[in-house]
Design a protein with these regions (language model features):
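Short, structured helix-loop boundary elements
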Residues: 10, 40, 92, 122-125
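Carboxylate-rich helix-loop segments that flank metal/cofactor sites and access channels
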Residues: 59-92
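Alpha-helical bundle segments that constitute or directly flank the non-heme di-iron/ferroxidase center
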Residues: 3-34, 92-115
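Hydrophobic stripe of amphipathic alpha-helices that form coiled-coil interfaces
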Residues: 34-37, 41, 57, 64, ...
Length: 147
């Protein structure tokens, strides 16, 4: 477990955008490497959703839609090396790592929503958190079909 401390909301947004980009790259890579149609479709959908999340977060950051107040936010991250791995792994292990990543993303967006005062942005962040939870649930369902 690694602790990351953020000093401003913009720091959190930049980190979230970077994580979304890693997820996009990873899910796209997984979609291209699997021969299972259902799993490929799931990976492609996850990548598409993460592209949308990145665009939303980038817009919030670039348009200064969120007040960049000073914060002291600590996020406990369990490193998900699967995003950075180029080697092929067991599909179940890959899915389990993706599940952990989605759980962490959900928590991060909920934590950020809790310290945000703007109600519109708060709803956006909670929606993204909800979608990350739905990703986790989809991955769990896919994992169960492979057991």
């Amino acid at each position: 477990m690694r602790k990351i401390t953020f000093n401003t909301i913009y720091d959190v947004l930049r980190f979230a955008i970077s994580e979304e980009q890693s997820a996009i790259r990873y899910y796209t890579q997984q979609a291209q490497s699997t021969t299972n149609y259902e799993t490929r479709t799931l990976w492609e959908q996850l990548a598409t959703d993460e592209i949308r999340h990145k665009a939303i977060l980038s817009n919030v950051l670039e348009q200064h839609l969120l007040h960049n107040k000073d914060i002291n936010m600590v996020i406990n991250i369990d490193p998900v090396d699967v995003y950075n791995s180029e080697e092929e792994s067991d599909l179940n292990a890959v899915i389990c790592e993706a599940i952990r990543a989605e759980e962490q993303a959900c928590k991060m967006y909920n934590d950020l929503a809790n310290i945000t005062e703007d109600e519109t942005i708060k709803r956006v962040l909670r929606t993204i958190a909800s979608e990350e939870k739905a990703h986790r649930d989809s991955l769990i369902n896919d994992l169960n079909t492979h057991k």
